[in-house]
Each structure stands twice: as C-alpha cells, then as structure tokens.
C-alpha cells in the first residue's frame, strides 16, 4: 500500500484539471446589449454555472470515492450545553464565538411536562 496516496493525489489532480476545464468553458457574459438581453445572458450563465458545479461534485465523488452524505458530527449531550454570558459579553456578535461552554452540573432543562 505504499503507492496508494500517490495514486489518490494523481486522481485528485485529474479531477481538478477536468473541473477547471469545465469552468473555463463558461466565461462570464458580455456587458453589451439591452438590459433585458444582459439579464437573460446572466441568468443562462448562472444556470450553466450551477450545472458545472453539480458536475464537478459528481466528478470529485467519483474520483475520490467520497460519500454523498457528510460525516456526522459528534456533539456533547444537550443537557451539558450552557449559554454562559457572565464573562466578556460583547455586542459585536463575534465575541464569545468558538467552543461551547459546558457546565459542570447538569441542570434540568425540561421538566416532565406537568405544570405546578
């Protein structure tokens, strides 16, 4: 199995070259003509781009043997997840993004469904 990774790299390069040729065969539309003509050309160009994208995905999955469905992500149990805003909460929307805060104790999130 010493040459297996080289074969896989070569397959990947073939797939990338083929996909590159597909994208090069569909240049962007020209900016000439009436507004309606330009709009129609852009619409047809975007449809061809979508087709090329789906063909490229099929080529990659064929050459690389990728599964169609993504690999499931292992998440911690929901009862251990906690939104903790006690430290450094900003209003920019980017602070605090990253690994989830996991509390030590497991608080009861949902009761059994009976009201008091």
Curated annotation (Swiss-Prot):
Source organism superkingdom: Viruses
Principal location class: host cell
Cellular component, GO, one term: host cell cytoplasm
Motif (Nuclear localization signal and RNA-binding (RRE)): 34-50
Span of the annotated motif Nuclear export signal and binding to XPO1: 73-84
Sequence segments annotated as region (Homomultimerization): 18-26
Residues the record lists as Phosphoserine modifications: 5, 92, 99
UniProt PTM: Asymmetrically arginine dimethylated at one site by host PRMT6. Methylation impairs the RNA-binding activity and export of viral RNA from the nucleus to the cytoplasm. Phosphorylated by protein kinase CK2. Presence of, and maybe binding to the N-terminus of the regulatory beta subunit of CK2 is necessary for CK2-mediated Rev's phosphorylation.
Compartments in which it is found: Host nucleus, Host nucleolus; Host cytoplasm
Residue ranges, annotated region (Disordered): 23-49, 86-116
Basic residues: compositionally biased ranges: 36-49
Keyword NAD: no
Record-linked Pfam families: REV
Gene Ontology MF terms: DNA-binding transcription factor activity; RNA binding
Keyword annotations of the record: AIDS, Host cytoplasm, Host nucleus, Host-virus interaction, Methylation, mRNA transport, Phosphoprotein, RNA-binding, Transport
Note: HIV-1 lineages are divided in three main groups, M (for Major), O (for Outlier), and N (for New, or Non-M, Non-O). The vast majority of strains found worldwide belong to the group M. Group O seems to be endemic to and largely confined to Cameroon and neighboring countries in West Central Africa, where these viruses represent a small minority of HIV-1 strains. The group N is represented by a limited number of isolates from Cameroonian persons. The group M is further subdivided in 9 clades or subtypes (A to D, F to H, J and K).
Quaternary state and interactors: Homomultimer; when bound to the RRE. Multimeric assembly is essential for activity and may involve XPO1. Binds to human KPNB1, XPO1, TNPO1, RANBP5 and IPO7. Interacts with the viral Integrase. Interacts with human KHDRBS1. Interacts with human NAP1; this interaction decreases Rev multimerization and stimulates its activity. Interacts with human DEAD-box helicases DDX3 and DDX24; these interactions may serve for viral RNA export to the cytoplasm and packaging, respectively.
Family note: Belongs to the HIV-1 REV protein family.
Free-text comment on this protein's domains from its UniProt entry: The RNA-binding motif binds to the RRE, a 240 bp stem-and-loop structure present in incompletely spliced viral pre-mRNAs. This region also contains the NLS which mediates nuclear localization via KPNB1 binding and, when the N-terminal sequence is present, nucleolar targeting. These overlapping functions prevent Rev bound to RRE from undesirable return to the nucleus. When Rev binds the RRE, the NLS becomes masked while the NES remains accessible. The leucine-rich NES mediates binding to human XPO1.
Function, in words: Escorts unspliced or incompletely spliced viral pre-mRNAs (late transcripts) out of the nucleus of infected cells. These pre-mRNAs carry a recognition sequence called Rev responsive element (RRE) located in the env gene, that is not present in fully spliced viral mRNAs (early transcripts). This function is essential since most viral proteins are translated from unspliced or partially spliced pre-mRNAs which cannot exit the nucleus by the pathway used by fully processed cellular mRNAs. Rev itself is translated from a fully spliced mRNA that readily exits the nucleus.
Name of the featured protein: Protein Rev
Species, as recorded: Human immunodeficiency virus type 1 group M subtype D (isolate Z6) (HIV-1)
Name of encoding gene: rev
